[in-house]
């Protein structure tokens, strides 16, 4: 089974808020989300193309595990907490299936 990825992009338009957002996401949100989702692992990045974009990626062993981990019941408290702490921050969510992975030869 190919791995599935759940990708969340948040746009932090105000540069003055990015350090606080980064700290909160690292200490509070990411550990909670990984545990709640049952993700295999997670990582996050700030875009060099658009510095306002924060992208968090959660990896699951397969699509069924992703679907079990991101039900509305599991997502609701995470979304509510995000909206409470960071009101008005737009987000997008994507589900992707890995189709190929190669390493250097």
List PLM regions with ranges.
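Macromolecular interaction modules
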Residues: 1-105
């Amino acid at each position: 089974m190919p791995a599935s990825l759940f990708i969340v992009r948040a746009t932090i338009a105000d540069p003055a808020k990015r350090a606080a957002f980064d700290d909160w996401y690292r200490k509070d949100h990411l550990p909670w989300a990984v545990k709640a989702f049952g993700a295999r692992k997670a990582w996050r990045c700030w875009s060099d193309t658009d510095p306002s974009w924060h992208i968090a990626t959660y990896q699951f062993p397969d699509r069924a595990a992703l679907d079990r981990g991101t039900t509305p019941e599991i997502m609701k408290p995470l979304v509510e907490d995000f909206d409470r702490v960071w009101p008005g921050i737009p987000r997008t969510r994507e589900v992707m299936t890995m189709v190929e992975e190669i390493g250097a030869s």
